[in-house]
Amino acid sequence: MGLFESNLPKHIAVIMDGNGRWATSRGKSRSEGHREGAQAIDRLMDASLELGLKNISLYAFSTENWKRPVTEIRSIFSLLIEFIETRLDTIHKRGIRILHSGSRKKLTRGVLDKIDFAVDKTQKNKNLTVNFCLNYGSRDELLRAAQELFLERKRSKVALEKPLKEKEFEKFLYTSILPPVDLLIRTAGEQRLSNFLLWQSAYAELYFTDTLWPEFDKNSLVDSLKWYETRTRKFGGLTNG
């Protein structure tokens, strides 16, 4: 495949778009589309392990998604609970670590308990980290981080006007233990970031595919990695020569 471990992105972020369109095009309900999208997450985890990827962040539910119909929201969270209940043992045995990025506000006690259990059970796993961004919005994250930094400086009696360094700020991000995003994939043809990991994706390569999320498979992932290999990453500088 021409993929070498040294060239693999250390952190891939995925905007999983197209569940609804997949369902509508087949005369199915949006809930059925989300269920099929959960199968695509399984395929992504399998392929990531096989290819040697280490960190994946998935945009599962945004802070803006609360505007959707109540029935659809209930279906999404019901699927999340089912996903954890039916797959967690296998995920754990395969050495996959689960993380959660996002606000805990608005999430029910039942959902939080399932997430916390999955995070706690898999915390020592090292083969692959899958970060579920649930009730996540990048602006919300940055505001929360700024507030926590302010409170921390106040508690520590550090002068508030002291110049702020990136590393100090990043400690308060949900993704503080993850490397920056190298590759951001968005499915279903849309070409926008939708308030997803804006700080973390500052120098990410952006890969847009028309493939709907329920149809995303190992070949789709390999295509994105081959494309990533062709990119010259400058990080604001110049290429040699």
From Swiss-Prot:
It comes from the Bacteria. It is an enzyme of class 2 (transferase). GO terms for biological process: polyprenol biosynthetic process. Binds 2 magnesium ions per subunit. Substrate binds at residues 18-22, 30, 34, 62-64, 66, 68, 186, 192-194. InterPro entries: UPP_synth-like, UPP_synth-like_CS, UPP_synth-like_sf. Mg(2+) binds at residues 17, 205. One of its GO terms (molecular function) is prenyltransferase activity. The active site is at 17, 65 (proton acceptor). Its EC number is 2.5.1.-. Its cofactor is Mg(2+). Keywords: Magnesium, Metal-binding, Transferase. Homodimer. Belongs to the UPP synthase family. Catalyzes the condensation of isopentenyl diphosphate (IPP) with allylic pyrophosphates generating different type of terpenoids. This is Isoprenyl transferase.
